[in-house]
C-alpha cells in the first residue's frame, strides 16, 4: 500500500463527507470514506496526527477536484466559489468494486483447489503455486479490508472448497500478523507458501468433512493426525526448496514451543507458530457441516491468548491484524442498531460499522456509516450471523471504506 501524506488543512468542512479513507503512517484505517467528521473532539484528534491516504485514492480525488473547479470556471463563478468547489464524495462507478473483489477471490480459490489436488514433481506445480501466491498477495495489498470482509463473511456461511478457501484466509491473517511483527520479506514469503500448502495431503478430505454432518471415522482421524508430516513430505518430493516453508508445514500443529520467546526460536519454528495461530482462528470462525461457525471474539480467545490467558507476542499481533470485530462480522451498537463491520479501526475494538437495522428493528434503505469511537455507536456485542435476516448490497456497504476508485477485477493468471 503506497501512502500519500495529507495536510490537516485539506480536510473537508464539517458538513462534508470524507472523499477517501484517512489512514495513519502504518496504513491502519482511522476514518472511512463517506463519514462526516462532525465530532469536534474527533476532528481535533485527527488534526494532531500525521494523516495519510492511499496514493491512488488521493490522485483520483485531485483529478475530480480539478474537474469540479474547471466546471465552476466555465460557468463564470467568482474566484472564491471556484476555490470552494468540491466533487461528490464518491463516484457512481464504485458499485462494481466489491463484486470484483469477491469474484477475484473465488477465481483464486478455484485455481488453488486445482493446484492442491495436483501436487507432484513432474509438472509445473511449483510455478503455478508461486504465481498464485503472487496474485493473492497483490490482491490483499490492494484491497485489504474488502478481502478480510470477504473471507469472514463467506467463512460463516459456506463450506464449498473449504480447503482452498481456508488456505487463502490463513495466508491473509498470517502475512498481516507477520508484517506487524516486523519480519523480513523472505520469512513472510515462506509463511505465505506454507499457509497455502499446509493441508495439501488432506485437501479432498477437508472438503468432504466440511460438507457432512457426521464426525470423522477412525481412519479419517488417523489421516488428519498425520497430515502435517505427510504434507511436508509431498512438498519436498515436489521440489519445493524453501526449507523454512517445508519445515513450518511439518511443525504447524506442534504446540510445544508455545510460551517461549519468539526471537529465541528458529525461523521455521517462528513461521510454524504464526501459521498455527492463524490456522486456528480461521478454522474456528468457519462453518462446517457438523457445527456452526464460532464468533470472531470467541475464536480470538483460542487463537490469540498465550498459556497465561493473556495475548502473547503472536496473539497481540494477530489481534491487531484482524481486530476483535473483523470486517464481515455483525455487531450490535450502543445505539441498539445492528450492523456489519466494514473495516478495521485504529484499535481492535473500534471498527468502522455500516448500520443496517435501527434500534426498533426497521431496516435502513441505505447502510449508515457509524464511527465506533463515538460512544453513542460503540460496539456493544458481536451478533451471530444467523440472527441477521436483512438483505443488503455489499458494494454499498464496502463503499463506506473503499474510497472513490473503482478498481478493475483481477485479470486471469498468467496474463501479466
Language model: regions and residue ranges:
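Membrane-cytosol interface segments
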Residues: 1-128, 378, 383-416
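His-Asp-centered metal-binding catalytic motifs of divalent-metal-dependent phosphohydrolases/nucleases
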Residues: 188-215, 231, 246-260, 275-282, ...
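Active-site-proximal alpha-helical segments within enzyme catalytic domains
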Residues: 224-228, 268-286, 293-302
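Helix N-cap / loop-to-helix initiation motif
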Residues: 38, 184, 241-242, 295
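Acidic/His-rich, divalent-metal-binding segments that scaffold phosphate/diphosphate chemistry
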Residues: 80-225, 236-239
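Low-complexity, glycine/alanine/valine/leucine- and proline-rich hydrophobic stretches
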Residues: 36-40, 337-382
Amino acid at each position: 500500500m503506497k501512502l500519500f501524506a495529507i495536510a490537516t488543512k485539506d480536510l473537508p468542512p464539517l458538513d462534508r463527507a470524507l472523499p477517501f479513507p484517512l489512514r495513519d503512517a502504518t496504513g491502519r484505517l482511522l476514518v472511512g470514506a463517506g463519514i462526516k467528521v462532525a465530532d469536534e473532539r474527533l476532528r481535533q484528534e485527527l488534526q494532531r496526527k500525521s494523516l495519510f491516504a492511499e496514493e491512488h485514492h488521493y490522485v483520483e480525488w485531485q483529478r475530480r477536484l480539478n474537474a469540479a473547479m474547471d466546471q465552476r470556471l466555465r460557468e463564470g463563478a467568482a474566484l472564491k466559489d471556484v476555490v470552494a468547489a468540491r466533487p461528490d464524495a464518491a463516484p457512481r462507478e464504485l458499485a462494481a468494486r466489491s463484486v470484483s473483489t469477491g469474484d477475484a477471490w473465488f477465481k483464486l480459490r478455484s485455481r488453488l483447489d486445482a493446484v492442491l489436488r495436483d501436487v507432484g514433481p513432474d509438472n509445473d506445480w511449483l510455478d503455478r503455486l508461486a504465481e498464485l501466491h503472487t496474485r493473492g498477495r497483490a490482491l490483499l495489498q490492494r484491497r485489504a479490508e474488502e478481502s478480510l470482509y470477504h473471507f469472514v463473511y463467506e467463512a460463516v456461511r459456506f463450506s464449498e472448497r473449504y480447503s482452498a478457501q481456508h488456505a487463502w484466509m490463513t495466508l491473509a491473517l498470517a502475512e498481516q500478523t507477520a508484517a506487524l511483527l516486523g519480519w523480513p520479506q523472505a520469512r513472510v514469503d515462506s509463511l505465505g507458501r506454507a499457509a497455502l500448502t499446509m493441508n495439501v495431503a488432506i485437501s479432498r478430505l477437508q472438503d468432504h468433512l466440511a460438507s457432512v454432518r457426521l464426525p470423522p471415522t477412525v481412519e479419517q482421524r488417523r489421516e488428519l493426525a498425520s497430515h502435517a508430516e505427510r504434507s511436508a513430505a509431498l512438498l519436498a518430493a515436489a521440489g519445493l526448496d524453501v526449507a523454512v516453508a517445508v519445515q513450518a508445514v511439518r511443525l504447524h500443529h506442534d504446540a510445544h514451543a508455545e510460551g517461549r520467546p519468539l526471537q529465541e526460536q528458529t525461523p521455521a519454528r517462528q513461521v510454524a507458530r504464526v501459521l498455527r495461530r492463524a490456522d486456528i482462528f480461521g478454522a474456528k470462525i468457519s462453518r462446517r457441516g457438523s457445527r456452526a461457525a464460532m464468533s470472531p471474539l470467541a475464536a480470538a480467545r483460542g487463537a490469540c491468548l498465550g498459556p497465561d490467558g493473556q495475548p502473547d507476542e503472536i496473539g497481540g499481533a494477530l489481534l491487531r491484524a484482524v481486530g476483535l470485530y473483523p470486517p464481515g462480522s455483525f455487531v450490535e451498537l450502543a445505539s441498539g442498531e445492528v450492523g456489519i463491520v466494514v473495516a478495521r479501526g485504529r484499535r481492535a475494538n473500534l471498527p468502522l460499522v455500516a448500520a443496517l437495522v435501527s434500534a426498533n428493528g426497521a431496516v435502513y434503505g441505505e447502510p449508515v456509516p457509524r464511527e465506533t469511537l463515538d460512544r453513542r455507536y460503540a460496539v456493544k456485542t458481536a451478533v451471530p450471523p444467523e440472527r441477521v435476516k436483512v438483505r443488503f448490497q455489499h458494494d454499498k456497504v464496502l463503499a463506506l471504506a473503499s474510497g472513490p476508485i473503482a478498481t478493475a477485477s483481477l485479470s486471469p493468471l498468467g496474463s501479466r
